Amino acid sequence: MNPTTEQVLSPGEIFRQTREALNLSLEDVAKEITLRPSILEQLENNEFIQKSTPAIFVKGYVRSYAKFLRLPDSVWENIVFAETEKNDLGKNARSTRAVNQYSSHNRWIGRLTAIVFMIVIGMTGLWWWQSYQQNTQERDDLVQSYVASTENNQPATALVTTEESNKTVPETAAPVSQPVEITNNLLPEIAQENSVSQPKNDEKSVSEIQSAVENPSISPTLPIAKGDLVIEILTNSSWISVKDNARHVLAQKEYKQGEILTFNGNEFSLIVGAPSNVRITYKGENYPLKVDGRVAKFKLSQP
């Protein structure tokens, strides 16, 4: 009868009978192997499959309990600590269908993402192009306003020089006619007073006065405008651009006949649209311009 009962005993019953044979309670064993009494009770009730505890931990509990009770490993080696999974042959087919179902969805999402990305790139490029054109327009407007301001300032200086030149001409021309009348009345007296002391000087001065009386229209040529660079518009009109050595615009517009520009300095960059209509005097000397029907671009400098 005993062999039959031993074969029928389960591992949990063996654990319980062995513990009772040693006169040990669950609390005593729990203190020795540092396990909760509830876990030992589950093991004695053959509850080796637990959903809240992984199988590897349950197996460790059984090994520790059997080692403490000095039971052979054959008592618990055949215990199943987890449910065996059945071989599902249709699992691969179901997973394949699921993958194929979602792959088409993923392709549609990918295409939509690509379209949205292209739209974003296009909008970004359009915004950049519009801002670039706006910046270019603002830059052009700034340059044009600067050129217009310089052109508005240059005519004032040109008018001042022309007015001053017009004032100097009558002042210098007025004394020419007065000596004619004075010399007509005082010529004999001057000749008589100076004939005793300086006869040579008298003859020279008398000849000069007589030539002035005989040719009252002849007068010494006086410079109309003074400056290191003088530009005169002789006929029609011409485009004139003048810059100094620092590339600052001194004059830049179309000037008409009779206008005179004067500048002071040593280095200038000039652009003359019609060289045949312009006369340039630099440092008191006439600067020859090449008349070939083309725009003249040159620099003036003096060390």
Curated annotation (Swiss-Prot):
GO molecular function, one term: DNA binding
Domain of life the protein comes from: Bacteria
Cellular component annotations (GO), alphabetically ordered: plasma membrane
Protein name: Uncharacterized protein HI_0367
